[in-house]
């Protein structure tokens, strides 16, 4: 019987072959060699991702394509978890890059016998700024603050299978945005041990179109859906001051776009 890999990277993918190739190269370059990468193709229509993975000629790459009638990032993430052979599950979007020791650190940080999630610092980069810069704030975990805003950057997360199973349901299919926030909120309520790790584990690619007004409107609607489905009590955004680092408070309260994104539409003084 084959021994399961120490770490499984979970990679939902759709088109963007060059970015996926770079993401997989960052897996292949890991200092820990005992890993697998589970790539779930969410109906790519302008790229042959299966052929791309074949050309890499690495048996640790595990590819599947969603069936007709299936689709969406939540379904792709759930399928990746289901196919993963390791008890340590590491988030990697198809356009992001692992740092070389990420798998080794996740092996050290996660105990498969426990329901645990860790999140690290991330480095923000783009095509125009390939070196990038660290995301400025790493907020220590606060369950009370997570009820109000999502301070966990999804590309920097890793968790045990026990943590994923703790809420009783994985990523919910009704979400095409904020699906990570919904899951992490339910994990926290289910008693998962969540911890910030003050290390850079991943580089998070920022796209030019990622901050458009239309996207922010859609994301705000998804955040409100998370709050309603999870019966989060209405709150004034200023309440984050009781739990958040001063720099995070400034980022959310002094920036009109961020304030609009995270404000609770249900709150009335």
Q: Model segments located where?
A:
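Cell-envelope/extracellular polymer assembly enzymes that use nucleotide-activated donors
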Residues: 5-8, 26, 36, 182
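A conserved hydrophobic helix/loop-capping motif in glycosyltransferases and polysaccharide synthases
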Residues: 7-19, 23, 30, 40, ...
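Acidic donor-binding segment of Leloir-type glycosyltransferases
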Residues: 24-67
């Amino acid at each position: 019987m084959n021994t399961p890999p120490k770490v499984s990277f979970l990679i939902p993918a759709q088109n963007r072959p060059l970015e996926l190739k770079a993401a997989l190269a960052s897996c292949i370059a890991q200092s820990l060699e005992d890993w697998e990468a589970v790539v779930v193709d969410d109906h790519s229509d302008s790229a042959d991702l299966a052929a791309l993975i074949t050309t890499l000629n690495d048996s640790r790459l595990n590819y599947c394509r969603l069936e007709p009638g299936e689709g969406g990032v939540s379904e792709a993430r759930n399928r990746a978890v289901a196919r993963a052979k390791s008890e340590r599950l590491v988030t990697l979007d198809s356009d992001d890059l692992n740092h070389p020791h990420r798998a080794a650190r996740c092996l050290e940080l996660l105990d498969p016998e426990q329901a645990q999630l860790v999140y690290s610092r991330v480095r923000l980069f783009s095509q125009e700024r390939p070196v990038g810069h660290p995301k400025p704030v790493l907020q220590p975990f606060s369950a009370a603050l997570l009820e109000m805003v999502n301070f966990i950057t999804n590309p920097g997360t890793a968790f045990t299978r026990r943590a994923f199973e703790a809420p009783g349901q994985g990523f919910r299919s009704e979400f095409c945005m904020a699906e990570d926030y919904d899951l992490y909120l339910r994990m926290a309520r289910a008693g998962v041990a969540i911890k910030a790790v003050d290390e850079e584990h991943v580089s998070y690619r920022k796209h030019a179109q990622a901050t458009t007004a239309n996207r922010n409107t859609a994301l705000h609607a998804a955040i409100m859906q998370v709050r309603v489905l999870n019966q989060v009590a209405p709150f004034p955004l200023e309440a984050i001051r009781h739990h958040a680092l001063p720099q995070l408070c400034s980022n959310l309260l002094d920036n009109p776009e961020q304030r609009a994104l995270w404000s609770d539409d249900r709150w009335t003084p």
